[in-house]
Amino acid sequence: MSGDVAAENSIHIQNGGSCEVVQSNGVTTNGHGHHHHHHSSSSSSSKHKSSSKDKHRDREREHKSSNSSSSSKEHKSSSRDKDRHKSSSSSSKHRDKDKERDGSSNSHRSGSSSSHKDKDGSSSSKHKSSSGHHKRSSKDKERRDKDKDRGSSSSSRHKSSSSSRDKERSSSSHKSSSSSSSSKSKHSSSRHSSSSSSKDHPSYDGVFVKPEPVSQQLMHSGSVDAFQMQQLGSYEAAAAGTNFNGNGNVAGANYKNGYEESIVDIKKEEESFNNLSQASSCDYSMSQFRADEPPFVVKHEQSYAEEDSTMNYNDHDDDADEMNDDEEDVPLAMRKRKQEATDRPDGGMDNDDDDDIPLLARKKVKKEKIKKESKEKSKKRVKEEPSDDYGNVKPKKKKMKKEPEPAVSPGKRQKAKAKVEEEEVWRWWEEEKRADGVKWSTLEHKGPVFAPRYERVPRNVRFYYDGKPLELSEETEEAATFYAKMLNHDYCTKEVFNNNFFKDFRKSMTPREREIIKDFRKCNFQEMFNYFQAESEKRKAASKEEKLIKKNENEALMKEFGFCMIDGHKEKIGNFRLEPPGLFRGRGEHPKMGMIKRRIQASDVSINCGKDSKVPSPPPGSRWKEVRHDNTVTWLASWIENVQGQVKYIMLNPSSKLKGEKDHIKYETARRLDKVIDKIRATYRDEWKSKEMRVRQRAVALYFIDKLALRAGNEKDEDQADTVGCCSLRVEHVQLHKELNGKENVVVFDFPGKDSIRYYNEVEVEKRVFKNLELFMEHKKEGDDLFDRLNTQVLNEHLKELMEGLTAKVFRTYNASKTLQSQLDLLTDPSATVPEKLLAYNRANRAVAILCNHQRSVPKSHEKSMENLKEKIKAKREAIEKCESEYHSRDEKKGKQLERLRDQLKKLELQETDRDENKTIALGTSKLNYLDPRISVAWCKKHDVPIEKIFNKTQRTKFLWAVHMADENYRF
């Protein structure tokens, strides 16, 4: 490495103490301009950085003055570790390069436009001697350091006279914090930049020099050569007449606002790009560079950490005072980072390693980090007390990698906040249960949200009767739109639906309209249908901004009306919106389908809230039907709907305490049944032989409820759908076969179950049950009840005698959960993959769904989704074949790829099997209503299956109590 310096600068001292540094590249720096900028916004972070670097460079500059050799290259750097262990002559050579780099650094600090204006006026002093140049550049550097150590927010930081700044200083005045000492301080140690490790402080003539927390590599404290170099540097500094400002800091160091953003531009510094070692031993502050020059930024910025050392130094009393002032300038965030930087395994990167790092790799510092540190500079600085145990041991400094703090976007903050709110769960299951029937002590809510008023369709959207447009009244038009919106639905093809609608449609008409509109077949709703279809498409094609506005409106409504306060806890409401007017559909083949559901008014609604709570306000100009304070019920509002005359409720969300408690009690009751089920089964078997027909019918019905998980079945009125349960079975629903398909005593059930879903099952029963059924069906014709001496009320009273809280639904819940538990034990292979375990779980779930007759029609999208899945499987198989053909000539990497492809194919094939098996089975119904969720939670925990694979978000929220309660050893 050459120690020559080619850059020649001249310094013009102004009367006010300002100076201009003119370099060969023509860039001029005005000291006062930068000084003022630093005064307004500099941070302790940049102060510390610049000071430590200046001291490192100026330590070597003293040898530059004694050696006449100079180089023509800027930004040269040498290995500092090599400097520390070489002879003093060779180390001075390397120091010369650091000095040269420092001179170049000064030139780069000139980023203001005024520096370019003074370019021509100062170019005449370019060709001075090399030693003179370094002397003056050091003088300029001292001024900047002096300015730096004055406070960033107080004007008193600049009250040193210009004469003290203009004093002649030697180029060796700046020592590194690890090697500098003055004639008065013989062994001043290098103080750590972190407040926790500040034990020995360098002092010059009794004055403390502030270091900075940057990744400068320090001299090994145990090295004798390094110590000799320190003392030699101290004596040379004293001989050169080194001066320091009154604040105890090297004068000079003009910086801009902390770390300024600089755009990396490699082409503008080709010399630095060619010499990768230039940035290795010198970490520049971002403010040292012009905005148009590429900064030398180390990839992993580092800070010091305290370590043991074997070299002892003596402290001066004034060091402790300077430490106190110094810590005041350190931002709290910076001190925190210093304290945390303790665990880097490699102990920092030495200079040789630094030299090996490509320049591009060292320039990857995020702009976000720079901006963040700039913001920290504007914060109020917190004074930190100095450590009382300042020892006389110089700690060895270890570089630590500083992880950049990730910038959090507003969206992520909102998600994080929402996550925190979700984690703040009301653990009601850990509270003591109340046995007095009281559901809550305090309840407050805002009431329901009413459906919006009807907005008439545009005048060009018309209703046609008998081919002619007909203008309708507002009420009649609204009724017509109800039907128009469903025009493409299957309901509109049903005669019952159309007849019921037209009957109510005529009720909404004016007398004149009623005279004209008499035949439903002449009504034409097509134009209205087209309008609503176009509106639907328009909503789907809305811009992101429009959708966001709508979303925000819904969220605001949810925030206001979607929550209530119950016993001091915020709970979500399930259906806070009242049902809008429309056409009644009903479940299954309901006889009232198509009837018009009228608009609900405030006068129809009863409110339930706490006595001491604020009663919800009704819409202006109206009043509630009733305000109640009943804490034995869980509903918040109720009304009677006009179609069936049933009471409708606004209830809490399934994830609420009241709903969760109800579920918990249901499953605990089913678990209690497990303890007495054998006794109950023995009882109804004995009753098959009873002399009373009533007892026999009850015993056979209970057998079917237990074995087939049938619903009890209530009697239906004529205006209700004809669905059948166990007690309401009729003769036509049951067929008896002495032998069928190789089975004996077979009973064939075929009847419409809940939601008019067909229940068909061929069951082999015990011989005594078969004979009893033959007895029950004697002398009965089609339409007669099979169990003519039994109803649900009688059955439930008997069940309560067998066990407290026992109902037909408890039997259904018990058998469903018991089936799931046994099927999981049977089908789950602990060594299987997660997809295979999921297939086993779905098969167990499907067994329950079949038991409970949870069927569904094949989804319309099933065929298309299966085709897509088969295409994926085909493509995956082709990829495997191609990979196998290349495998023999490939390395191990190809083998891993082949294994991965096979796993993916297996996963797709399992998915295809699972989807096809479940096309007519509704797994969700049993999962939500009949299966103890703790069984699934325990299975997931035991077999390392993510709970998200079993329960979706809604189900996880509903069963949060189960997730917290159950461990892997839970058994139903």
From Swiss-Prot:
Known EC number: 5.6.2.1
Superkingdom to which the source organism belongs: Eukaryota
Known catalytic reactions: ATP-independent breakage of single-stranded DNA, followed by passage and rejoining
GO BP annotations, alphabetical order: chromosome condensation; chromosome segregation; DNA replication; DNA topological change; instar larval development; oogenesis; regulation of embryonic development
Gene3D superfamilies: 1.10.132.10, DNA Topoisomerase I, domain 2, Topoisomerase I, Chain A, domain 3, Yeast DNA topoisomerase - domain 1
Modified residues (Phosphotyrosine): 304
Cellular-component GO terms for this entry: chromatin; cytoplasm; cytosol; euchromatin; nucleolar chromatin; nucleolus; nucleus
Biased composition (Polar residues): 11-31
UniProt protein name: DNA topoisomerase 1
